[in-house]
């Protein structure tokens, strides 16, 4: 599959070219029940396409009777409607951390349908490294580019 225009200049490690995929394919790599780290904080660099594809998949599973089809969602802080909102509307979040400000998340947390850890942002990294929060299964990050050595 040829890379979209301009992507080869940003994705400079040719070993990664074969891994380029659409949002639905990427979302399919996220297992139900996984603890998922997603990049972003407020409006900066939070994901939009993959969370919406994941939300659609989880909503379809819920409609088919698999009501436990949810993930743990770890971010750098509050994101936006395409991430927090989409996954919350799909009832796809089992546990959310740290800070969030999405109204649908807040409603589900207050109703006891979503677990929530309002840990201060400065404590999240140490809690993850120490295993206090369980295992981070997969991370999905938005980046501007990748250099030939992977940086």
Where are these regions (language model features)?
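Conserved alpha/beta enzyme-core scaffold
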Residues: 1-151
